[in-house]
Amino acid sequence: MVSKPHGGKLVRRLVAERTRERILSEQKEYPSVKIDHGRAIDLENIAHGVYSPLKGFLTSDDFQSVLDHMRLSDDTPWTIPIVIDIVEKTFDEGDAVLLYYEDIPIARMHVEEIYTYDKREFAQKVFKTTDPNHPGVAKVYSLGKYLVGGEIELLNEVPNPFAKYTLRPVETRVLFKERGWRTIVAFQTRNAPHVGHEYVQKAALTFVDGLFINPVLGKKKKGDYKDEVIIKAYETLFEHYYPKNAATLATVRYEMRYAGPREAIHHAIMRKNFGATHFIVGRDHAGVGDYYGPYEAWDMFENFPDLGITPMFIREAFYCRKCGGMVNAKICPHPKEFHVRISGTKLRKMIMAGEQPPEYMMRPEVYEVIRSFEKPFVE
């Protein structure tokens, strides 16, 4: 069986077309709030149930409960505060406001609460640091004085150049059932696949019916693979190296918080809402720099026996010259001098230099796809 949505019911915060047209015709009558791309994507994820059971941005009770207990105030597991900020009060509690991204009215929000918060507490409890060099902490420090809680209704979506690769939770659940998959393992990625990824995915697929590759599309940093490269590389990998109907790919737009262990739980909840029953938790999952231990995220799952999705902890793969193949530390008896770690950074440098990686690092078909792009990396 595909998993039950988090909280028991898949949230849908969409409005009928007639209602939408009426709201848009009256938009000048509403107070307005400008939002950034990340909040616009959060709105989409709330509206389509990716963040079920959230129906909007957190009120103060839920916000504080997430900080203190990693649960909503009704005790549902939830680890990342999904919030929207304002610099000053230009509307009141009880008002309805329109949220705009680049002059597009994305959603109507019913303001339940406007509240203050402690930025250092937010940073310390979510990211385990108050260091402004941490990108998540820097984001928190840039927020306005107030947070606004309340339910939302989606009016428009941010233009998506990869819409044909996007499936919502209501659609993936139908897809999994049509394929006859009772157990599904999800894999989150922001990279084109190398052989180490393939090893981990196939190790997980051994124990379930289907593999759900769910690339995260969104804000990129210099040197990252472009979104279209990731998608085409996976399509090629599926074509040549995966059993037919054993794997599928759909993208999700999401702004990484880099909250390490807490965000690993959040990622699992998102995939649970897509219908996955299992979730691959990687080494230093959702980490950045040296803020978190390499397997700290694994330990975090022990706090959530009621999460409703099974984590799969698969050790990092490497090539062993003695074994003659991809292995991990649990199954390879040979010393480190025989091991070749597959570094994503090293692979990118090789590709940038026009050097084809050896086949034990990257499938040649995948390399050819990457090479077919004039500029495969973000500049």
From Swiss-Prot:
InterPro entries: ATP-Sase_PUA-like_dom, PUA-like_sf, Rossmann-like_a/b/a_fold, SO4_adenylyltransferase_pro, Sulfurylase_cat_dom, Sulphate_adenylyltransferase
GO biological process, one term: sulfate assimilation
Leader sequence residues: none
Catalytic activity line of the entry: sulfate + ATP + H(+) = adenosine 5'-phosphosulfate + diphosphate
Gene3D superfamilies (UniProt xref): HUPs (3.40.50.620), Sulfate adenylyltransferase (3.10.400.10)
EC identifiers of the protein: 2.7.7.4
UniProt cross-references to Pfam families, sorted A to Z: ATP-sulfurylase, PUA_2
GO molecular function, one term: sulfate adenylyltransferase (ATP) activity
Keyword annotations of the record: ATP-binding, Nucleotide-binding, Nucleotidyltransferase, Transferase
Annotated metabolic or biological route of this protein: Sulfur metabolism; hydrogen sulfide biosynthesis; sulfite from sulfate: step 1/3
Superkingdom, taxonomy of origin: Archaea
Record-stated family: Belongs to the sulfate adenylyltransferase family.
PANTHER family cross-referenced by the UniProt entry: PTHR43509, SULFATE ADENYLYLTRANSFERASE
Name listed for the protein in its UniProt record: Sulfate adenylyltransferase
Taxonomic source organism: Thermococcus onnurineus (strain NA1)
